[in-house]
Amino acid sequence: MSNASLSWLTKLNTSETPDKVLRRSSIIGTIGPKTNNVDVLVKLRKAGLNIVRMNFSHGSYEYHQSVIDNAKQSEEIYKGRPLAIALDTKGPEIRTGTTIDDKDYPILPNHEMIFTTDEAYAKKCDDKVMFIDYKNITKVIEAGKIIYIDDGVVSFEVLQIVDDKTLKVRSVNSGKICSHKGVNLPGTDVDLPALSEKDKADIKFGVKNGVHMIFASFIRTGDDIKEIRKVLGEEGKDIQIIAKIENQQGVNNFDEILVETDGVMVARGDLGIEIPAPQVFVVQKQLIAKCNLAAKPVICATQMLESMTYNPRPTRAEVSDVGNAILDGADCVMLSGETAKGNYPFEAVSMMHNTAIIAEKAIAYQPLHNEIRSLANRPTPTTETCAMASVSAAYEQDAKAIVVLSTSGFTSRLVSKYKPNVPVMMVTRNHRAARYCHLYRGVYPFVYEKKTVDNWQEDVENRLRWAVSEAIDLGIIKKGDSIVTIQGWTRGSGHSNTVRVVQA
């Protein structure tokens, strides 16, 4: 593999241009004050945006409702590919209290003070006593451990656990004691609930408004995912849950989380505070690889093109970061402040689009397909066997596309797992599935609007002919090209068992 990889890399086209090429990965953009506008959303979609992210750490329900409404209106103006909407929860968190008169108190290194969970100090914090709103902090932390305040801007070492409400700490560096700052406990297992009351209300808002996915913050165990499913209920059962891995517990318990979740986000911001920064890229690679083998979509997020918040061009390191996330196997890459508050949102999406396309063309797909196939657990279920066979057939036949006649998107996800080097056209009547299939690398939704006919095989042929016609019109394939198709033997999801090779 290494020799084949080296040989492949030496033959890359270094003059590759991204013009008029289908991008396999998807782009997620956070919508904020700079971009919450119908015309702006249309322009972002034309630049390559696939999934709208709403950050529920900020904004009112009225504001988020306007994002949803504007996103839907943008589709009425510009059809393009269906747009998915994601709700990113605030998540359970630990914060400091309120300082006296809301002042900032400067401190120097080696400054000793008290951290307390005593509510009497919740609004009386200063440079002597700071309230922490996590009641069990004295039970879970140990002397010698570090506490980060304000995303690690200020660090404290725990000197002594004085009693069940009090810690004696010493500052590691200079900084300021301020109101309502986030608190991180790196290397310490915490027992916070999976969802705060705000999160539960936010998720119910999302269910009511038909969001397509939940980005669930600070997931620590598989049980956290189960709790979110309970809140989603029957009405929200089709909403995809994406587990954000942001702490050491999430990394340690990743295998059980992966079983329960629909997908994963490698959320490198808080993760880089909770674990040493040099370890983040190793965790990123491991988590993405595990997701690829499990056929679970994975998103790489945080600071990908951050300098483009205020600059029209990214740093070279940022471009490499985006490209390497694609090479690692990420299905989606995400923009945060770049599109939420940045001065160059269109340029950021366009830069990510172009970088992703070029990175995708640097991948040796067939050796990757062969490796994933060799690692599959045997015997494979029928649908996965068909998905695997369709990709192998596409390589053997030099097919130009794989057409999946799909109800739920499940088969398309499995086809994506086996890394085809051609587009996967998911033909479906299911509008929701067409939107969340953006999570799967290389899968393109084609919504078939015509009603079903009684004869099943006739309905299959109608959808296939329509898909071929659409693909030819879009320039994805040419008449006479070989294509591989997957279909079921009967109506409904979970019945895919037929693979064919046909001519366009």
From Swiss-Prot:
State where Mg(2+) binds: E246, D270
The enzyme class is transferase
Q: Which SUPFAM superfamilies match?
A: Phosphoenolpyruvate/pyruvate domain, PK beta-barrel domain-like, PK C-terminal domain-like
What's its catalytic activity? pyruvate + ATP = phosphoenolpyruvate + ADP + H(+)
Residues the record lists as binding K(+): N55, S57, D88, T89
Which residues are noted in the entry as substrate-binding?
A: R53, G269, D270, T302
Signal sequence bounds:
none
CDD domains referenced in this protein's UniProt entry, alphabetically:
Pyruvate_Kinase (cd00288)
State the needed cofactors, names only.
Mg(2+); K(+)
Q: Which InterPro entries match?
A: Pyr_Knase, Pyrv/PenolPyrv_kinase-like_dom, Pyrv_kinase-like_dom_sf, Pyrv_Knase-like_insert_dom_sf, Pyrv_Knase_AS, Pyrv_Knase_brl, Pyrv_Knase_C, Pyrv_Knase_C_sf
Q: What is its EC number?
A: 2.7.1.40
Residues at the site labelled Transition state stabilizer: K244
Instruction: List keywords of the entry alphabetically.
Output: ATP-binding, Glycolysis, Kinase, Magnesium, Metal-binding, Nucleotide-binding, Potassium, Pyruvate, Transferase
Question: What cystine linkages occur within this chain?
Answer: none
The GO terms describing molecular function are:
ATP binding; kinase activity; magnesium ion binding; potassium ion binding; pyruvate kinase activity
**Residues binding ATP, per UniProt:** N55, F56, S57, H58, R95, K181
Functional pathway: Carbohydrate degradation; glycolysis; pyruvate from D-glyceraldehyde 3-phosphate: step 5/5
The entry sums up its family as follows: Belongs to the pyruvate kinase family.
Name under which the protein is recorded: Pyruvate kinase
Taxonomic classification = Eukaryota, Fungi, Dikarya, Ascomycota, Saccharomycotina
